[in-house]
């Protein structure tokens, strides 16, 4: 498992511009399983990672959502290679749950148009939609899972609320922390489109692995609430005990 995650993120750690690809035999096998997987709206989830298309964005902070989808796809043997709904899409099984994995190929600010098409094509209700994306306000390599909320300044999520969910904010999301730039004069747009240094890349390997596990738990158990509780508890700020008062 760790080897697969390392493969997915090797573009982050080394600055390479190509993400991991499955062997041809594995892609063929996964595609056959995907074609045979029927979409049942009662049990089908759409897990959509946000990012920007094109190799020049591989390994950037803003593409962490894509990295999580690649990690899930690699471990579960789902080929996310079908071009539809303005995205790269793969359909398969995780446990007994049918899942649509997707990476919108619009640019980040237009992600909602692709998400809208995916929801319509695969008949995905909002309570079976899970969005994975980078978050500036979550500390580096930490995770937060939420059942609803505002866009928090993230243009991809803003687009989903505007274009896909008709203003409704009650859809699940996994926020992968990228932190704020250490230099406050660095423009945010430059920061999110930059690549991780080696030290941060090592931390992000673990973060992507944790995000993959959290998403897989949701799908295996068909239960968002329990997975969210476990994830958020793991990354909850540790309480600092007050020093004991000396006895008088």
Summary of predicted features, one role per range:
Residues 184-205:
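Short, electropositive alpha-helical surface patch
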Residues 153-156:
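Hydrophobic alpha-helical segments within soluble ligand-binding/sensing domains
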Residues 2-148, 158-175, 181-187, 208-238, ...:
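Nucleotide and nucleotide-moiety/phosphate-recognizing core
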Residues 144-150, 191-196:
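Short glycine-enriched, charge-decorated loop/helix-capping segments at active-site entrances
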